[in-house]
Amino acid sequence: MLLCAALQVFPYILRATLFLSMTRSPTAGIVRRPFGRLADGREVDQFTLCNGRGLELSVIPLGGIVTALRCPDRDGRSANVVLGLRSLDDYLLRNHAHVGTIVGRYANRIAGGTFTLDGRTHALARNEGKNTLHGGPGGFGSRWWSIDALPLADDGCVAVELGLVSEDGDQGFPGRLEVSVRYTLTLLDEWCIDYRQTLIPSPLI
């Protein structure tokens, strides 16, 4: 059950924490399972984190998509509490609403698919008529993210870290962007999301 959400913003660091109420269940750890295959033959694996108290988070490298967040109710019955699709094909063909994805380089739409920065106008790839939505047709939500399962922390936290490099000119945006997103489940039944990026030079994000 979602109790509250806290959001803290720092320069180039964003951390969101969701606090959930649950009961103790299986051992903490990370399980990797096949989720599907892309047209180019790449296998897509799903990483499922469990904090040992019943909170489970599943994520895939395509778009950094969170496919499920399962937690038990007061009677111990587990349920997925985030919107998700049924299969990899659904995410590839029907995810027009960007369900579960990491949005970038820019969230929301840029009217006309252009913007001016430091006196220079940048023309962007468009994917909503004349507009650029959520980073364009090749935005972060459709990209392949690396996923590293991190060792179990001394405090019992379970985490994975996703990484992506967006080169200068990607979708028309200036500057090279190195971004990482860490998903952590804690023994306090929190799902923590940490965003970090390195900007060379500082582009629009």
Region spans (language model):
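Aromatic (phenylalanine/tyrosine) cluster motif
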Residues: 10-12, 19
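Surface-exposed acidic/polar loop and edge beta-strand patches at domain peripheries
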Residues: 19-205
